[in-house]
């Protein structure tokens, strides 16, 4: 973003009827962990040119063409978080079933094969506990909602608050009620968290609108769930020189997050917001790849591949509760909702090199690029029914507002993967790998609570984290006994981030009576970490 503050008063984006998820929530679903077989993980995943491992089915399916024998494998292990404290149902150590798959080989010529593969692997493990705390110096989450009410105009990031027919405060587009024949229109900038504050804390006991200043905050959030990939591939080789592969992939999304956000007020009271959110759904993508041995007498290989966007069809739902405490406990205020949306991830491109020395050394290197600024949030805007096939097809259009915000906050990411395998004896392999994954978030990016989008309307939290680059270090060992193999891998992943409880708003001026008042709501960022280790075991059989 061009500035670290959001200036609501100059209108970030024009209002538009939209229905899509918020940028930071979408970013959680994009990208992949390093996971698969223990051999693949032990070599840092740098096998897109070396091939002959089932885990390449999802990156460069041409690698499936290097199998000479049919093979099945199964992988599971432990995922361990180094930092933080356990919270709710979040645990720092979790069992994980990570992979099962196989390859069936068929010979089509003296040096040519046509191979078929299937593999399930957990491409993203959400198990992670986030703990954050910091000072606020008079700013607060409820002040953000209060300022939006001051701004009024939806195009300026605000809303006009008045009572509905049930006596509840609602943020509307119009400053005055429309004609009785015209239903009032709720502003897209009116979020679920705004609804909670404007119907509890901001009116107070007297009904006079005001906000509470806070001295500090704490947040605890337990992320759980996964994205599971189901990949089906066909791959073949031409005279053991050119290998081609194509994968059709399906994805299963199961994410759950539960958080408790607390603020301590200057008046010795405080607020607690409990939020539970789920994201479920499915998606599919297509991957194509090629591996070439440019010199017939050399094992040196060059690989290239491209992965289409993952076309997701998702449902997000939440239940959020607010407890306002000012000397005594007040009744909880609750709100919840659910809606469907679509999201398309960016294209991914990869280039890889592989080489073997004799029968005991293998070297691999892979470079990948994926531009997360091109995440496409989609609006479900209707559909049509195909009576011939007895199917309903839902249509969608881009959420222009949210996609523009995504381009401000997210960016292109380069990934470098390096790996080596050494066999001191023919049936024992030692492996080592390294990954560098660039940061997908802009350093000064932040949520935009004034965005006219249903991604804002259904938002139930205000915090966000700008995560930095990832460094992964891997080790592995493999042992072969006749047709059986057992492999073990260890992975350490380190990532730092900058957490903020809400977005910064600076220098909003309004008139109260004859007095001009200028408000700002600034939150200091807090450093957080996502450091975790993985132990992974693979059992395989060749036939």
Q: Where are the regions that the model predicts?
A:
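Bacterial Sec-dependent N-terminal signal peptides
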Residues: 1-25, 539, 543
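Outer-membrane beta-barrel porins/channels
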Residues: 21-35, 40, 105-543
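Outer-membrane beta-barrel translocator/receptor signature
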Residues: 38, 50-59, 64-137, 225-228
């Amino acid at each position: 973003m061009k500035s670290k503050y959001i200036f609501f008063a100059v209108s970030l984006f024009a209002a538009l009827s939209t229905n899509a998820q918020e940028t930071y929530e979408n970013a959680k679903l994009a990208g992949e962990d390093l996971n698969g077989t223990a051999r693949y993980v032990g070599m840092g995943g740098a096998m897109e040119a070396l091939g002959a491992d089932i885990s390449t089915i999802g990156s460069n399916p041409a690698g499936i063409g290097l199998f000479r024998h049919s093979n099945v494998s199964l992988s599971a292990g432990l995922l361990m978080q180094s930092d933080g404290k356990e919270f709710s149902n979040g645990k720092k150590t979790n069992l994980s079933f990570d992979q099962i798959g196989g390859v069936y080989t068929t010979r089509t010529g003296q040096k040519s094969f046509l191979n078929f593969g299937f593999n399930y692997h957990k491409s993203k493990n959400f198990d992670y506990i986030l703990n954050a705390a910091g000072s606020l110096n008079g700013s607060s989450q409820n002040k953000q909602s209060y300022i939006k009410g001051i701004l009024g105009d939806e195009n300026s990031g605000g809303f006009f608050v008045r009572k509905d027919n049930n006596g509840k405060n609602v943020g509307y587009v119009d400053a005055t009620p429309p004609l009785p024949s015209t239903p009032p229109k709720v502003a897209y900038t009116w979020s679920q968290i705004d609804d909670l504050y404007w119907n509890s804390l901001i009116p107070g006991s007297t009904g006079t609108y005001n906000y509470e200043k806070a001295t500090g905050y704490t947040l605890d959030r337990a992320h759980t769930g996964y994205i599971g990939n189901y990949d089906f591939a066909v791959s073949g080789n031409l005279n053991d020189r050119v290998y081609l592969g194509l994968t059709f992939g399906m994805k299963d999304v199961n994410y759950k997050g539960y958080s408790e956000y607390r603020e301590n007020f200057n008046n010795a009271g405080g607020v607690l917001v409990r939020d539970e959110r789920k994201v479920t759904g499915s998606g599919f993508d297509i991957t194509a790849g090629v591996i070439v041995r440019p010199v017939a007498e050399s094992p040196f290989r060059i690989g290239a591949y491209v992965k289409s966007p993952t076309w997701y069809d998702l449902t997000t739902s939440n239940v959020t509760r607010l407890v306002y405490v000012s000397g005594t406990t007040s009744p909880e205020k609750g709100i919840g909702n659910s809606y469907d949306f679509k999201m398309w991830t960016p294209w991914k491109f990869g280039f890889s090199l592989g080489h073997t020395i004799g029968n005991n050394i293998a070297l691999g290197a892979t470079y990948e690029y994926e531009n997360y600024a091109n995440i496409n949030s989609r609006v479900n805007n209707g559909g049509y029914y195909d009576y011939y096939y007895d199917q309903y097809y839902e249509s969608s259009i881009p959420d222009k507002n949210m996609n523009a915000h995504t381009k401000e906050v997210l960016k292109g990411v380069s990934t470098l993967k390096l790996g080596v395998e050494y066999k001191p004896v023919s049936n024992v392999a030692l492996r080592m790998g390294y990954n560098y994954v660039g940061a997908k978030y802009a350093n000064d990016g932040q949520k935009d609570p004034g965005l006219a989008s249903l991604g804002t309307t259904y938002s139930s939290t205000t915090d966000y984290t700008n995560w930095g680059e990832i460094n992964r270090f891997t080790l592995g060992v493999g042992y072969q006994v006749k047709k059986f193999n057992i492999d073990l891998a260890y992975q350490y992943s380190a990532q730092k981030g900058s957490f903020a409880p809400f977005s910064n708003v600076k220098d909003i001026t309004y008139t109260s009576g004859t007095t001009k008042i200028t408000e700002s709501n600034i939150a200091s960022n807090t450093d957080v970490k996502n450091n975790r280790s993985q132990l992974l075991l693979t059992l395989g059989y060749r036939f």
